[in-house]
Amino acid sequence: MNHLYSKTNLEEMLEAGVHFGHQSHKWNPRMAPYIFSERKGVHIIDLIQTSNLLHEACDFLANAASNKKEFLLVGTKFQASDLIKSEALKSRCHYVNQRWLGGMLTNWMTIETRIQRLKNLETQEKLGAFHHLPKKDAAHLKRQLNQLQKYLGGMKYMKNLPDVVIIVDQQKEIIAVQECRVLGIPIIALVDTNCDPEIVDIPIPANDDARSSIRWILSKLTAAIRDNRF
């Protein structure tokens, strides 16, 4: 990493608030190697470590993208939801940004049938089929369509299990983490000072609550994917 890039990188991270962890009494001791100091009862993340691990993650994603791998972005907390969707769309990735439904990966065959149902309902609506049904039936199908779009819309074009999963807020998305571990799917995750870095493949120590921090990290990860797709 050249010195100028490293300096700019650190300045950008400071500006985005990437270094602010949680209150020190909420920490996970396994995050100790990634903590720089404590200030006014709040842990400060070591941004040199963040930078190094972010580079490792970007290299991994760039290589995966060049080999035509598929990616799933997961982040359902309100600070991350719209950022997950916009970054996923820009980089042609799949995403979950509303709620992780148990079994989304480990019960993939069932999820596949729900995705097919979503596509069928979208086709019916587009063709105007709902207009030919009794109002009650049409309203029921419309509600069903809205629900499926809300929870599965970001996975609509996912034909198989993803090759890599990127997660914002490991604690909130712990079920997604567990499913990936069961299936052996590599996980890249933002890990705040209250997280366990040992249960993901590439942990990126970072503030996972501030939108500015989430946006900054996500933009780097998805750029690595976008710039290396063919």
From Swiss-Prot:
Highest taxon of the lineage: Eukaryota
Q: Which residues cross the membrane?
A: none
Gene Ontology biological process terms from the UniProt entry: translation
Entry keyword Plastid:
yes
Q: Which GO terms describe its cellular component?
A: chloroplast; mitochondrial small ribosomal subunit
Record localization: Plastid, Chloroplast
Query: One Pfam match, by short name?
Result: Ribosomal_S2
Q: Name one GO molecular function term.
A: structural constituent of ribosome
Keyword Repeat carried by entry: no
The record's principal subcellular location, in a coarse class, is plastid
Q: Which UniProt keywords apply?
A: Chloroplast, Plastid, Ribonucleoprotein, Ribosomal protein
> Can you tell me which family this protein belongs to?
Belongs to the universal ribosomal protein uS2 family.
Q: What's this protein's name? A: Small ribosomal subunit protein uS2c
* Gene this chain is encoded by: rps2
